[in-house]
Amino acid sequence: MLDIKITINGVTPLICNKFTDKAALAATTGVSSNNRGEPLTPHEQAEEKLYMDKKKACIPQPNILASIIEGGRFHKIKNRSVTTMQKSMIPSCFDIKGIMLPIKTKGWEVDERPVRIPA
């Protein structure tokens, strides 16, 4: 086996939306609790959505692998897509070590621009 160390550099803001226990409860029971306390600042809201490991921002390994697999739809090998609707060649080629991959940064700021996620 060959180990290769890579660094992924983003060119656009990173959108994180961790699936919390509160969201899981709302999804399974259909009931969401309204927090009637003080409204959270944008920074506090964003902090709740971050994946954290040892008090540092990170990304789960399955999320990175799924992103790479999805990106395979746009790459072809001999006129054949690396990833199709049903299967992908990518998991047979490599794996990513670790469970939570650190986001190495000097800090972060909240991007408060409105986001439209296409359906």
Regions found by a protein language model. Name each.
Residues 1-119:
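RNA-interacting cores
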